Structure formats: structure tokens, C-alpha cells
Amino acid sequence: MYRIGIDLGGTNTAAGLVDDSLKIIDKISVPTVLPTDPDSLTDGMAMLVRQLLSRNQLSAKEIHCIGVGVPCTANEENGCMEDAAHLGFESGAFLEPLRKKTGIPVFFGNDANAAALGEYSTGGYDQDSLIMVTLGTGIGGGIILNGKLWSGINYAAAEFGHMTIRNDGVPCICGRRGCFETYGSGYALIRRTRECMETDRDSLLWQLCGGNPDKVEAKTLFDGAKAGDTAALQILDGYTTDLADGLANIINIFQPAVLCIGGGISKAGDILLQPLRKKTALRICTKNAKRNTQIILARADNDAGIIGAALLGN
């Protein structure tokens, strides 16, 4: 039997046909059109499912289930997507409409939770606890305890991006101030970079973005830091300090064996990881213990979200 995993992202929606060994046999990725509504969303996903079945000469009866990772709260009790402002609506029915449109059992979960499950299942871990923090447009997360995904009583656990790290800090889309993602997300890093560039017209960052701040990406900052640009190094220092504050909070609460950094920002590699490890180590309560949480970059590739989504039906 096969499974289909769908990773609904803010930029792209990817659907993959997954076999019993968790290998992706075929994959389709299309741009995510936002804002949207629940009916249009399930129509698009049903179309992706039909395309995968057709391309691989399979029938719906040969698919064990469809699993979907969504960037909002996935209420398993009523089958609705909730708190879905990023998608253009507040809430809406999801599981039953998609099941009717495909004829296949459907399961869903938060996208970062699904990525954590995919990472844990394919990354070769021998520990029974792992926390994943995804650094992308925002900050998400997933919690693996005793080898199982933990999503909380309201299916909204691991919203690490919305813990406060600065009182009266930068306003967040959630309505609060000083949330972790307003300082540690990819969007926050780009904001910091643009602000710093305006005060340092000689920075290499101007050259790296072609003189247009609107073209600044996270990669712009990391490339500047690797080249030794003073402004870029200052931005990176402040960014990793704020990241370390948030990660230390998570470690102090959960004490996981592994804390895994995923998402687009993690692709920066050691220039991000090394200062992050050092600064976090200074902030945790057990800094003198013989055994502490390993902070690593995600081992699985960008397909972890698809594989994790496919496993939501377990």
C-alpha cells in the first residue's frame, strides 16, 4: 500500500507518493495561491492526488491514506482547520471535504509537527525525544516524546514562535508583542538586514542585493557574513543571540535529547549553528551537566514535511 503526503506551504504545495519504506516514489509541487478558502484548498489538493494516481497508474483503493501538513491548527475532533489567518480565512471544514473529493481516508496535522515526525522517522535517530524548531517565514515546531508526536489538548502544541522573548517588543501577527518569531524568523532576519543597511551605505550587503533592499533574502545576510562584512556580522550576532534566548527556553522546559533546527534558514549551515550552540549553552539551566541537549541541523531534506504528513495516518 502507498500513502500520499501533502505539505501545504506558504509558497508551494508539495504532494508525494510514499511507499512502505518511506521512500518518495513521485512528487508534484505547485505554487500556493493565497489568500484562499477551504473549498478551493481541498479542490486543489484533490487535483494533486488525482495527478499522482494517474501518473503512477494507481487507483484510490491502493492508497492507505492521505496525510496533510497545514500551517495552522489542525483540529482532529471536528476535522476543521482553525486559526488559519495565514491562508486567508479563520476556520473551515477540511478532512471530510477532501475525503469526499478523493475517496481516500484523510488525516492532517500542523505542518511543523509533520516535519518533525518526518525528520524523526527518517533521520536515523536512536533517541526517544526530539524537538524540531523550523525557521522559515515564521517559526514553527514539533515535539516528539517517547517516540511519538505530541500535539497537545487543542492540537496546537509547539507554537514556539509565539512565546515572548521581549516584553513590549516588535508587534507580531498574533496580536502580541515580542514573540520569538518577530526576532528569530527568516522574515525578522530580512527586516534586521534592511534596517542595518540603511545606516551603513558602504556595507557589502548593498552589492549582494544589487543595490535593491527589496531583493534582500536571508542568504544575502549569510553570504555577507561569510565574506567578513562588518554589518552582516553584527546582524548575525544579534540574530543568533535572540535565537539562543528562544532555544534555551525550549531546552529548559523539555530537556529533549535532540533539538533539531529545520526550515529554510537552517540551510546556512555552520555559520548559523556554531554561534547558536555556544550562546544557547550559556543560557540553559543545566550548563554544567555531563549530558545536555544536542543542537543539530535537520538531517532530512525538504521532503521531511511530505513524509511526516504521510505518517499522520498511523
Question: Whereabouts are the PLM-identified features?
Answer:
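Conserved A3 ("GATE") glycine/threonine-rich loop of ANL adenylate-forming enzymes
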Residues: 11-12, 112-114, 137-140, 167
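Short beta-strand segments
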Residues: 7, 67-71, 109, 131-138, ...
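A charged helix-plus-loop insertion that forms the helical arch/lid used to bind
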Residues: 79-90
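Structural signature of FAD isoalloxazine-binding scaffolds in flavoprotein oxidoreductases
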Residues: 156-159
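Short hydrophobic alpha-helix segments
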Residues: 28-30, 85, 153
